[in-house]
């Protein structure tokens, strides 16, 4: 008998990474299959822009919230929801690949709770500092701030 251990066909990915991954993919699937298919009809583009406008983090949002004292769920939720909305399908593909690759590496060294915490804190800090320091009128959306947090965690 041999002690040969077969490696799995697909490397196991931590559950916490899969939860984040499916959150990103579900939003994109809603946009693609709910509004006319993968070729990017006008309805898909309009709905994507509506999501960006309603759930992205605009510049000076945090400053405005502190000045007015308005911490309603509509504004606070933007800091948590924005990483699940991407500007294009290609952005989703790159974000998904980087998330799975870096998330697997980080998930091997940290617990699932720590991985979720790294993702959440990276996106929250990125949104907060963007909203108090941005000078242009671009709205912050996309999964990359959380992925950059995984880069930092992996190099740690």
Model regions and ranges:
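Alpha-helical transmembrane segments and their helix-start/interface "positive-inside/aromatic belt" motifs
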Residues: 7-23
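Hydrophobic alpha-helical transmembrane segments
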Residues: 17-22, 93, 116-120
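Residue-level recognition of pore/gate-forming positions within transmembrane alpha-helices
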Residues: 25, 122-123
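N-terminal TM1-TM2 helical hairpin plus the immediately adjacent luminal interfacial "cap"
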Residues: 28-116, 133-140
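Active-site His/Glu-centered metal-binding helix of metallohydrolases
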Residues: 93, 97, 128, 147
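Alpha-helical transmembrane segments of multipass membrane proteins
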Residues: 105, 124-132, 154
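Cytoplasmic-side transmembrane-helix entry/capping segments in multi-pass membrane proteins
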Residues: 113-121, 142-147
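Membrane-interface micro-motifs in multi-pass membrane enzymes
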Residues: 138-156
């Amino acid at each position: 008998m041999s002690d040969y251990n077969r490696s799995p066909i697909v490397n196991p990915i931590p559950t916490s990474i899969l939860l984040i991954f499916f959150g990103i993919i579900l939003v994109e699937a809603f946009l693609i299959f709910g509004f006319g298919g993968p070729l990017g009809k006008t309805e898909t583009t309009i709905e994507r822009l509506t999501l960006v406008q309603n759930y992205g983090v605009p510049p000076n949002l945090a400053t405005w919230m502190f000045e007015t004292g308005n911490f309603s769920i509509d504004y606070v939720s933007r800091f948590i929801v924005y990483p699940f909305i991407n500007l294009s399908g290609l952005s989703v593909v790159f974000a998904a690949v980087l998330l799975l690759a870096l998330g697997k590496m980080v998930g091997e060294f940290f617990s699932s709770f720590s991985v979720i915490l790294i993702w959440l804190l990276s996106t929250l800090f990125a949104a907060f500092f963007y909203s108090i320091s941005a000078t242009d009128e671009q709205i912050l959306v996309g999964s990359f701030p959380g992925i950059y947090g995984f880069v930092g965690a992996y190099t740690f």
